[in-house]
Structure formats: C-alpha cells, structure tokens
C-alpha cells in the first residue's frame, strides 16, 4: 500500500504531538509491558507513568494486597525484603577508623608530646647555667696567713707555672683548696709582669743619653768665660770676623787653665794652629769644632767620688760621639 506524502506528514505530526505521544506510550506499555524512558517520565513530570516505570511493583502490591488478609507476616516480608536481616547498630556505636575525633585527639596528643619535648629542650643546662649566676653568692676574699704567703712565695720562686700535682701538694701543705692556690699563682704572675714592665721602663730612662749627660762643674779660674763664650757647642760662636780670638778679655789659651780646671770642654778653645789660621780670615757663620783630642787628663783635683768620674766619662763619650757626627757636616 502506498501512502501519499501528505498522509505521511499528518501521521508524523500526530505521532510527534505530546498528547498522541503519551497515548502511544500508554498503549505500547500495556501491550509490550516494558519501561518507557521519556524525558517527562524520567524527570517525574508525568505521574501517570509510574505504573509503566515500575510494573512489577504494582503486581507485587496487588498480590500483597490480596494475601494481606490471610498472612500478615508474609506481607511484612514482601514489603521489606531485607527484614529478616538483623538491624544495623547505631553508627556512633561502631568503631570507625576514619573518625575525625580520633584523628584530632591523636594529633593533639602528638602535639602535646612535641611541646613537652621542646620545653624539656629549652630547659637545657645552658639555660640552667644562665639562671644560676643570679643565685650565686659573692665569694668571700681569702685571707692568707704569713706562713701560707711564705710557702706560696717560695713555690713561686721555684716555678711561676706549677703543674696541678705541685699545686695540690702545696695546697695540702698550706691547708688551702687547690683552686685558691691556682688563683693566687695567677694573681702573682700578673703582679710579677707589671713589676717587670716598671723595672724595664726605669732602666730605659736611666740608660737614656740625654738624662745621663750632666754638665761638669766649672773651675773658678774659667769664670769669666761664662759671659764671653757659649757652653753648648751647637750654638753659633759670638766672635765677629774682625775680632781676634786672643783679644777677648778673659780668654785663656789651651795651655793655661783648661788642663787642670776644665778638661771636659776642650773643644771650646781651638788649638794654636787653628787660632793662628783664624786671625787673617773671617770665620764662617757656623764653625765646626775641631776633632776631639784626648790629651787632657780626666781626673780632677777635687774629685769627690767615683760616681762623678763615671758621669764625666759618659759626658766625654757623649761629646766625642757628637763630634764624630758633626765632622762629616764640615
């Protein structure tokens, strides 16, 4: 049989309309007895299709309704197919291994142990030692007896750094703790070092050439010479170019009074050949003294002690060294 195109379109439109579609679904469900998977049925918009979706439930319900009058126990079994199983206990009674409370308690316990460990570490011996000096009392000063000081000084003369055995033996001898003996030796060494420094500085001051150089006493016979000639050799000579050396009043030659009166400063009066050469020509502005000649005796007539002689010897050596340094300058 051949259908026209208009007839087929009408059939399609009638089949695709919502009302005809539901009727066809109902008829198909009654004939075939299968479930209908339409959008309205799945979403629950059409309540009439519940019987189509669960045809077995309706049959069970009718069957149970028919047998409910005779056997109520079987009704409960059919309505509740799992009723013969023992009911589950409350979830709070079952021990769950993934309970949040158990994890929180366990974490709290671990954190508590960690805090205790940190606190125990913080209370280490270092912190205890830091708090201990606050409670420590000041040690009293040890008063040594004469016998103890005598024995300690004798031991210090033998050795400035005694070993522990020597200190223990000495402590037993003087009836003192070994720690006190050790501290005494430390203080005694410090005192000894200070004394050594003081002595060394004193010796340096005594050995200094400027302090050891003392000007010897002048003889009365050369008294007028103080006003005419300078005593220091490095000062310029007051002699003028026109004044002869022998025309100065109070001037004495090298053979008159300097041999016995003033032996230390012979360079103030030049030798005779030098004086004669100075007469015709003018002296330079800075005259160089002649070399020191050791032809005058060192001993003085009124020499009091050997210390004065030693001082004069040092002065003589100092002047000679100064002359040697001035000679290249000339």
Curated annotation (Swiss-Prot):
GO cellular component: a single term: nucleus
A matching Pfam family: Homeodomain
CDD domains membership: homeodomain (cd00086)
GO MF annotations in UniProt: DNA-binding transcription factor activity, RNA polymerase II-specific; RNA polymerase II cis-regulatory region sequence-specific DNA binding
SMART domains: HOX
DNA-binding residue intervals: 137-196
Chain span(s) of sequence motif Nuclear localization signal: 312-316
Subcellular location: Nucleus
Bias kind Basic and acidic residues: ranges: 90-104
Tissue: Expressed in the outer nuclear layer, in cone photoreceptor.
Keywords: Developmental protein, DNA-binding, Homeobox, Nucleus, Transcription, Transcription regulation
Example of a GO biological process term: regulation of transcription by RNA polymerase II
Motif Octapeptide motif positions after renumbering to this chain: 37-44
Motif OAR: positions: 306-319
UniProt KW Amino-acid biosynthesis keyword: no
Annotated region (Disordered), positions in chain: 66-104, 118-142
UniProt keyword Cytoplasm, yes or no: no
Function per UniProt: Plays a critical role in eye formation by regulating the initial specification of retinal cells and/or their subsequent proliferation.
PANTHER family listed in its UniProt record: HOMEOBOX PROTEIN, PUTATIVE-RELATED, RETINA AND ANTERIOR NEURAL FOLD HOMEOBOX PROTEIN 2
Family, as annotated: Belongs to the paired homeobox family. Bicoid subfamily.
Full protein name: Retinal homeobox protein Rx1
Taxonomic source organism: Danio rerio (Zebrafish)
Taxonomic lineage: Eukaryota, Metazoa, Chordata, Craniata, Vertebrata
Gene name tied to this protein: rx1
């Amino acid at each position: 049989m051949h259908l026209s195109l208009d007839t087929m379109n009408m059939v399609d439109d009638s089949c695709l309309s919502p009302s005809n579609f539901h009727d066809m679904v109902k008829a198909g469900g009654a004939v075939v007895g299968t479930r209908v998977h339409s959008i309205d049925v799945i979403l629950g918009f059409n309540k009439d299709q519940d019987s189509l979706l669960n045809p077995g439930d309706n049959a069970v319900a009718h069957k149970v309704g028919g047998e409910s009058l005779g056997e109520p126990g079987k009704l409960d079994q059919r309505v509740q197919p799992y009723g013969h199983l023992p009911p589950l206990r409350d979830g709070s009674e079952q021990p769950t291994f993934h309970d949040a409370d158990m994890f929180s308690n366990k974490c709290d316990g671990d954190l508590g142990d960690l805090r205790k460990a940190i606190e125990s570490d913080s209370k280490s011996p270092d912190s205890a030692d830091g708090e201990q000096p606050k409670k420590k009392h000041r040690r009293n000063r040890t008063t040594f007896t004469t016998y103890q000081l005598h024995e300690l000084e004798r031991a210090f003369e033998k050795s400035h750094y005694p070993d522990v055995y020597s200190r223990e033996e000495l402590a037993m001898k003087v009836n003192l703790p070994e720690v006190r003996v050790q501290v005494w030796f430390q203080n005694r060494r410090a005192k000894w070092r200070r004394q050594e420094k003081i002595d060394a500085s004193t010796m340096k001051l005594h050995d200094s050439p400027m302090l050891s150089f003392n000007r010897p006493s002048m003889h009365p016979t050369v008294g007028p010479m103080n006003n005419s000639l300078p005593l220091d050799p490095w000062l310029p000579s007051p002699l003028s170019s026109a004044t002869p050396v022998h025309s100065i009043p109070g001037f004495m030659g090298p053979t008159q009074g300097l041999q016995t009166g003033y032996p230390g400063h012979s360079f103030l009066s030049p030798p005779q050949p030098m004086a004669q050469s100075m007469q015709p020509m003018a002296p330079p502005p800075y005259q160089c003294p002649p070399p020191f000649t050791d032809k005058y005796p060192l001993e003085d007539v009124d020499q009091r002690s050997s210390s004065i002689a030693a001082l004069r010897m040092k002065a003589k050596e100092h002047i000679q060294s100064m002359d040697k340094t001035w000679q290249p300058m000339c």
